[in-house]
């Protein structure tokens, strides 16, 4: 390889690192990030555009879900907005989330979607204000009503979505092993874990089962470009 080519590749590698493409500990590189500061959400595809908007929240632009969606033929989350073109297998999806429903509603929730293939086939992490067999779970929708797939027994998973404050989240999936981990606030210890390979890949997204809230500072890491 010519010396000039070596220099070019070295500079390209440095450029990728400067752009945020450095692989993390799991070997996943930054594929996309979105902070909504330009005031739009062109990269997002909501199931009901009338229920989503970008608003100024104390000087920061955020992506807000303003109303619950309509129930479908299967029991599943009613509102989602998918990150267009972000079809991944193994990934790390992180950001900030806030539930805006009255905290007195203990079953309030916000959801993180992944491996979304169509409205009847996807996974979701259900961060909630209480824990039982259907709240604060990792759920699978596979052509039928959602089922709980996380390992934590019903009612024992750690729930933290009990206020109207912002919470940091992270969802990690290893498509080869089926391992899924969901974190809220504490990025070192997952609150929900599962192992399932029913759906191998798909889009990621944000939303809720039947509540309102907002999202910001979203980042997606995965394999490839």
What feature does the model see in each segment?
Residues 95, 164-175, 180-182:
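Short tryptophan-centered beta-strand motifs in secreted/extracellular beta-sheet-rich domains
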Residues 192-216:
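Flexible glycan-contacting loops in extracellular carbohydrate-active proteins
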Residues 24-49:
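Extracellular carbohydrate-recognition regions
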Residues 71-143:
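Secretory/extracellular carbohydrate-interaction modules
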Residues 53-79:
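Short carbohydrate-recognition loop motifs
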Residues 36, 218-220:
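Extracellular beta-strand elements of beta-rich domains used
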Residues 144-168:
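Short, aromatic/His-centered strand-loop micro-motif at the edge of beta-sheets
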Residues 79-86, 155-161, 205:
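Beta-strand-rich interaction surfaces with strong enrichment in secreted/lumenal proteins
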């Amino acid at each position: 390889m010519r010396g000039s080519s070596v220099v070019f590749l070295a500079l390209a590698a440095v450029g990728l690192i400067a752009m945020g493409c450095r692989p993390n500990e799991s070997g996943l590189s930054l594929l996309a990030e979105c902070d909504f500061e330009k005031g739009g959400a062109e990269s997002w595809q909501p199931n009901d555009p009338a229920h989503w908007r970008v608003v100024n929240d104390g000087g920061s632009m955020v992506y807000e879900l303003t109303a619950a969606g309509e129930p479908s033929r299967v029991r599943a989350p009613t509102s989602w907005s998918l990150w267009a073109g972000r079809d991944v297998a193994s990934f790390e999806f992180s950001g900030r989330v806030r539930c805006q429903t009255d905290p007195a509603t203990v079953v309030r929730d916000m959801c993180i979607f992944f491996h979304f293939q169509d409205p009847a086939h996807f996974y979701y992490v259900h961060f909630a204000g209480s824990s039982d067999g259907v709240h604060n779970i990792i759920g699978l929708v596979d052509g039928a009503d959602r089922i709980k797939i996380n390992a934590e027994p019903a009612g024992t998973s750690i729930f933290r979505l009990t206020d109207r404050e912002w919470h940091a989240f992270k969802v990690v999936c290893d498509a080869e092993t089926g391992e899924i981990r969901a974190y809220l606030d504490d990025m070192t210890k997952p609150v929900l874990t599962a192992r399932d390979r029913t759906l191998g890949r798909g889009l990621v997204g944000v939303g809720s089962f039947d509540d309102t809230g907002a999202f910001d500072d979203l980042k997606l890491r995965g394999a490839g470009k």
